[in-house]
Amino acid sequence: MERYESLFAQLKERKEGAFVPFVTLGDPGIEQSLKIIDTLIEAGADALELGIPFSDPLADGPTIQNATLRAFAAGVTPAQCFEMLALIRQKHPTIPIGLLMYANLVFNKGIDEFYAQCEKVGVDSVLVADVPVEESAPFRQAALRHNVAPIFICPPNADDDLLRQIASYGRGYTYLLSRAGVTGAENRAALPLNHLVAKLKEYNAAPPLQGFGISAPDQVKAAIDAGAAGAISGSAIVKIIEQHINEPEKMLAALKVFVQPMKAATRS
């Protein structure tokens, strides 16, 4: 959890925002997935947002669903994902690692056991995509017991009550949703979210990172100009993996070429 605090403090000092890529663990196989994650970090990622493959990903558009199918095809299990997380943490001791996942995967383990395992391998935050704030108590309590930041999604139409709840319960960062709907690079991030950012700040929420539909450097810059602490990009990155599925080296080179200007756009 503290890794987010030190990251945001360092970025503030350097007058930079955070660039946070999302990928599915184990896509397209364990070995290449670990190389992908190393490449993202080398190219400038400030933190990681990682998915654990799940059979029914409601919030995900087709691009990320395909990533999940590729991981399943490679035989990747949640247990192997945790082994990968431990390896990533060993290799990269300071980078914040967040999980983006679904409640069933938490229930399968038992809520407390799941967060205990997160703590053990060095995961900093968990966003459970299909658990609304009002049902989040058992999740966030277990998270805090194990020093894992509970992350909440702030939708573009959030009312005042919801903003207060998100500010009060969330730690690490706040996931600021560019728009409603499912993930996907083809639907560009829409409206400026200045008013939400201002309210979240007023209520002392964890720093907002804008996600959903972030696929170009100008959108990263726009998110930061609107007051966000950074931006999360998933589908655009996963699409690069898909396009170079049979050319592992080209894939890594293309990921680097994508991430470098995205990170550069965070520097004012």
UniProtKB/Swiss-Prot annotation:
Catalytic activity, reaction form? (1S,2R)-1-C-(indol-3-yl)glycerol 3-phosphate + L-serine = D-glyceraldehyde 3-phosphate + L-tryptophan + H2O
Q: In which pathway does it act?
A: Amino-acid biosynthesis; L-tryptophan biosynthesis; L-tryptophan from chorismate: step 5/5
Q: Which Pfam families match?
A: Trp_syntA
Which Gene Ontology BP annotations are present?
A: aromatic amino acid family biosynthetic process; L-tryptophan biosynthetic process
**Cellular component per GO?**
cytoplasm; cytosol
Instruction: Enumerate the InterPro entries for this protein.
Output: Aldolase_TIM, RibuloseP-bd_barrel, Trp_synthase_alpha_AS, Trp_synthase_suA
Question: Which residues are annotated as active site?
Answer: 49, 60
Superkingdom field:
Bacteria
> Which controlled-vocabulary keywords does the entry list?
Amino-acid biosynthesis, Aromatic amino acid biosynthesis, Lyase, Tryptophan biosynthesis
Q: Name one GO molecular function term.
A: molecular adaptor activity
EC top class, as a word:
lyase
Q: Which family does it belong to?
A: Belongs to the TrpA family.
Q: How does it assemble?
A: Tetramer of two alpha and two beta chains.
Instruction: Summarize the protein's role.
Output: The alpha subunit is responsible for the aldol cleavage of indoleglycerol phosphate to indole and glyceraldehyde 3-phosphate.
What is the recorded name of this protein?
Answer: Tryptophan synthase alpha chain
Q: Which organism is it from?
A: Escherichia coli (strain K12)
- The gene name on file is trpA
